[in-house]
């Protein structure tokens, strides 16, 4: 056990960082803060801390230094454009093999879930406005560990992984292969490599937004931000079911016909790549990926047909 964290319970079986870890006294002293409570985070754990009666967020990064720098530069650019984000004020500093940083605490609450369709449509409109500024940001290539769906779907390693696990996970592999083949057929003729790209947020979900009295006061969690097709931001904001997000987006920024065609295979490529990575790493997701692959929406067009 390194001296930067104290572990209260075992890490989860799926291979993600344990959420019960606490920053050590050494870490708290480094930033001159007092621990208040854990804030969560699937990959990058966060804690609410206090210094001189001000609240801050302490973060332990799981990414490489290169990926961290990518995110820090992006958030700083967005702050300069007037978006309510939380640029790092101290760090990152490396202690015992981990990077740590301190950022402002953004108050507010996630959008109300009382009227889900209205929330989704409003979030779609907000995403289009966010993209208008994201598209102005230049000087960013691809983030380490990411690639666009055309590279994913043409990767023979996917087929090799599925073949390797066909005997032990036959039904899961059958579902993955069926969707992989349909996604590949769907992108034929779209000339994706020639299409423009932009930086996307990657997880524009209600829990990553904060509002006060109906006013946006926080956009959180850029750990999945990367360079992609702009409709790549529909993957985790739409998830194959929240159609109003896409309709709201299109109200502000209409989609091209090719982009409508791309939404489904891009979403499936994301799921299939993650599933194959889990297979290679021997981790599991309790069936979440397969459940999402089997989700259907009228926006899928020809791919709204059921698996079979």
Summary of predicted features, one role per range:
Residues 114-174, 197:
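A cross-family kinase active-site recognition segment
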């Amino acid at each position: 056990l390194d001296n930067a964290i104290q572990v209260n319970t075992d890490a989860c079986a799926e291979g993600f960082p344990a959420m019960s870890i606490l920053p050590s006294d050494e870490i708290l002293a480094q930033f001159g803060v007092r621990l208040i409570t854990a804030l969560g985070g699937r990959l990058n754990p966060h804690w609410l801390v206090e210094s001189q009666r001000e609240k801050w967020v302490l973060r332990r990064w799981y990414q490489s230094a290169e990926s961290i720098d990518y995110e820090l530069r992006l958030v700083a650019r967005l702050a300069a454009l007037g978006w309510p984000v939380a640029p790092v004020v101290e760090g990152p500093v490396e202690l015992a093999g981990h990077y740590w940083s301190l950022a402002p605490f953004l108050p507010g609450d996630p959008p109300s879930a009382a009227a889900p369709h209205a929330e989704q449509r409003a979030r779609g409109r907000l995403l289009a406005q966010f993209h208008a500024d994201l598209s102005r940001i230049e000087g960013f290539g691809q983030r380490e560990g990411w690639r666009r769906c055309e590279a994913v779907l043409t990767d023979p390693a996917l087929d090799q992984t599925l073949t390797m696990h066909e005997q032990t996970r036959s039904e899961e592999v059958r579902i993955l292969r069926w969707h992989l083949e349909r996604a590949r057929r769907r992108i034929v003729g779209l000339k994706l490599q020639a299409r423009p790209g932009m930086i996307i947020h990657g997880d524009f979900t209600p829990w990553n937004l904060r509002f006060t009295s109906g006013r946006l006061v926080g956009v959180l969690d850029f750990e999945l931000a990367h360079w992609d097709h702009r409709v790549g931001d529909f993957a985790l904001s739409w998830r194959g079911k929240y159609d109003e997000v896409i309709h709201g987006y299109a109200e502000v920024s209409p989609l091209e016909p090719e982009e409508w065609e791309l939404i489904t295979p891009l979403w499936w490529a994301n799921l299939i790549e993650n599933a194959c990575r889990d297979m290679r790493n021997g981790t599991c997701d309790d069936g979440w990926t397969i459940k999402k692959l089997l989700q259907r929406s009228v926006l899928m067009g020809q791919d709204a047909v059921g698996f079979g």
